[in-house]
Amino acid sequence: MIAQLFKELDPTMTISLRTRLLTVLMFTTLLSGCGVNNIPQYDEQVKSAWAQVENQYQRRADLIPNLVETVKGYAKQEQDTLTRVIEARAKATSIQVDANTLDDPAKLQQFDQAQQQLSGALSRLMVTVERYPDLKSNQNFLALQSQLEGTENRIAVARRDFIASVEKYNTEIRTFPGKLWQMTMYRDQKVRENFKATAPNAEQAPSVKFQ
């Protein structure tokens, strides 16, 4: 193969120049085979996975105002529960973490805690709804509940994908030869923070269905 490349080079080149060019080509091929491109590739996977996490949490937040208004029409006396959902949503949407700040453990923890608090508030709201048969049979509420259930499932999938992509990326820059490439070519690439499993089944979607 090398001999064939050597023959196909411009014949006007000197042997020395052709040799240097082939050396560069061989070195580039060698680097590629040694995973020199893994870090940027895995970094893009982390960013893509995080974008899905953000999208699904935003979709959930967008469903909540209509859900609250629908419940309020049937259960005005549950104002305290509804207020807790509204406040939890406001807090969750106020904390923003973009793909470029995923190396900030405090920021990601704040984001995750706020989202988990919102999950808890929604679960308590669904328990409250059990006391209102007319609300449980309302078509608008049933549609919102179905959308919310689907979104919670997609959130769980997005979180699992993000966790897996971060673990893959972090392993790459902590082990050889990835650590060597990080130290020499990708010094701006840092270890990414990940979600912490704070409870059993933490990555499972919370139930928003009636028992």
PLM regions and their residue ranges:
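A helix-centric hydrophobic-segment signal that preferentially recognizes long
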Residues: 2, 6-211
